């Protein structure tokens, strides 16, 4: 088999948001616990909640809700979660920060001619608020979220980015912190990079066969530069 070829046009980096670009672990964990408490249920705790981050909200909640919680109960939990998240987000002390080096990485990729997309389990409202609050609109050429189509790990959001930006799978990389991100990228036949500073562990990302797992923004940048030069992240 011949070695992979570098992209013939601008490469495309597709980023997850929560746990990849922004450290939202604390606020998401607290919001999920508050949602369960509002329904009189035992809070799941962060170690359970982290396993379902990235999925569309109702699908995620259904996975961790106690047996006996029906579809209406899941919908109520989702509404409680949204309300708790909005309330917590209004507290300046609860603002989820960009990870160190994330802004600089986006600036570097843009300067090198990359196109940048987003594939996130956030709602459209949540994604728009994130982009506005962090002043990131100048970086993203396309962005798709849970409101636009099927949940991760379905390939939809990656394929939508590809179609919107007229890119082929071999010209794109999916970057994310969960197995759902990696499987979504694999289902769309694009290269995948796992980052181990978010919700899923390095071992979990290796188990789902990410092309490479990185631990720092500089390692992520190096993998993306390799992709632009050689068509592979390793």
What are these regions (language model features)?
Residues 212-216:
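Short acidic-hydrophobic, aromatic-tinged amphipathic segments that line or gate anion-handling sites
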Residues 32, 102-131:
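Substrate-recognition element of Asp-dependent hydrolases with the DxDx(T/V) motif
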Residues 95-97, 117, 123-174, 179-188, ...:
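Substrate-recognition "cap/lid" segment bordering the active-site pocket of phosphatases
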Residues 6-17, 21-104, 110-112:
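N-terminal helical cap/lid subdomain that shapes the substrate entry/recognition surface
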């Amino acid at each position: 088999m011949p070695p992979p070829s570098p992209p013939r046009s601008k490469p495309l980096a597709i980023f997850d948001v929560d746990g990849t670009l922004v450290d939202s672990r604390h606020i998401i964990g607290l919001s999920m616990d508050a949602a369960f408490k509002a329904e009189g249920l035992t809070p799941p705790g962060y170690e359970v909640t982290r396993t379902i981050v990235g999925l569309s909200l109702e699908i995620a909640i259904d996975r961790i809700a106690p047996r006996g919680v029906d579809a209406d109960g899941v919908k109520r939990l989702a509404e409680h979660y949204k309300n708790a998240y909005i309330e917590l987000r209004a507290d300046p002390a609860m603002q989820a920060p960009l990870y160190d080096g994330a802004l600089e990485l986006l600036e570097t990729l843009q300067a090198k001619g990359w196109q940048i997309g987003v594939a996130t389990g956030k709602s459209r409202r949540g994604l728009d608020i994130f982009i506005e609050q962090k002043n990131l609109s100048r970086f993203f050429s396309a962005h798709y979220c849970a409101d636009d189509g099927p949940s991760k790990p379905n390939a939809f959001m990656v394929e939508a980015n590809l179609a919107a930006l007229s890119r082929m799978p071999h010209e794109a990389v999916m970057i994310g912190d969960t197995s759902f991100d990696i499987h979504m990228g694999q289902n769309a036949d694009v290269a995948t990079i796992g980052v181990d500073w978010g919700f899923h562990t390095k071992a979990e990302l290796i188990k789902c066969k990410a092309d490479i797992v990185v631990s720092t923004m500089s390692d992520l940048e190096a993998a993306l530069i390799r992709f632009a030069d050689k068509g592979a992240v390793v």
